[in-house]
Amino acid sequence: MKPWAIALCLLAAGSSVHAKTTVWQPVAGHTQIPIWPGAAPNLQPVPGPETQTHNPDKLIGGLPMTAVTNVTQPTMTVYAPQGKNTGAAVVVIPGGGFQILAIDLEGTDVCDWLTSRGITCVLLKYRVPSVPYVWQSDSRPHNLSLSVPSLQDVQRTMRLVRAHATQWHIDPHKVGVLGFSAGGFLVAEISTNFERRLYPPVDDADKGSSRPDFAMPLYPGHLATEDGKLNPNVPVSGKTPPTFLVQAEDDYVDGVEQSLVYYTALAKAHVPVEMHLYAHGGHAFGLRPTSDPITHWPALAEAWLSTIGMIPVAGR
């Protein structure tokens, strides 16, 4: 069993000690917005009520991670930009092996960074766990049917963000996605399956497009088959949005071949793509500072957003 799988098991095992059996809530001043007006489509049973777990024994960047699981009512939380508004927005998709959501490490931490750069952040709390409930290290490539509920949540959120563009002071042509690990896989899925409607329209928001204007999958999983080919459930084409990839070569959960195979497919399709590989960094580092050079990836991402015209060049 790989370390990330072990970590998930430890979170589950320690839940009786560290869990707060309450639904995760954002900090004061922010409100979760249900993304479905009623019950979500393809609703699956989960092992118990939604919970958030804090494990002080497992620190990442000197801080514990908050894990959310058993999500049946997906929500989005909007974080307005600080200072000058660039008009850009990013839907942030935390990872967690489709079993939990690393809601702070790969969620609120990211929103703090994005909003400090004048970018609206929309944090998606999508449905987990997927069936089967037990994460298995040999379950790659991730079957599209297993992530349909999560991908439905991503499609719906993209459309809702554009539907609220005027209200939230967002340019509807500058709406992107950023995700980590399993969330990185969802970034690749929404980047290549946006023309595939996965649920019946529920309101006028669903008349809009779910295609991201840019995509940032970080240490993504489930993209490479065992023989080194691209997961066929991620049909890259010339319509796939510009993409920014980051991964560590010593990623012990989702090997670097995940990014390499996706980069190759994007390049062959003439999709603008930028990839940064680092010798060290492991997996699930988020934005928390470390001594490794990979900790500087946010500055590279910000520069990339400028080069593709999503935000102004720094200092202008």
PLM regions: where:
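Cap/lid segment of the alpha/beta-hydrolase catalytic domain
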Residues: 97-106, 123-149, 191-195, 199, ...
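Short amphipathic alpha-helix adjacent to the substrate-entry channel of hydrolases
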Residues: 104-122
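Conserved alpha/beta-hydrolase "acid-adjacent" motif
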Residues: 252-258
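Primarily recognizes the serine-hydrolase "nucleophile elbow" in alpha/beta-hydrolase
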Residues: 149-238
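N-terminal cap/lid segment of alpha/beta-hydrolase-fold proteins
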Residues: 21-85, 116
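Short beta-strand element of the alpha/beta-hydrolase
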Residues: 86-95
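Short beta-strand/loop motif that positions the catalytic acidic residue
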Residues: 239, 245-247
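C-terminal catalytic histidine-bearing segment of alpha/beta-hydrolase fold enzymes
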Residues: 260-316
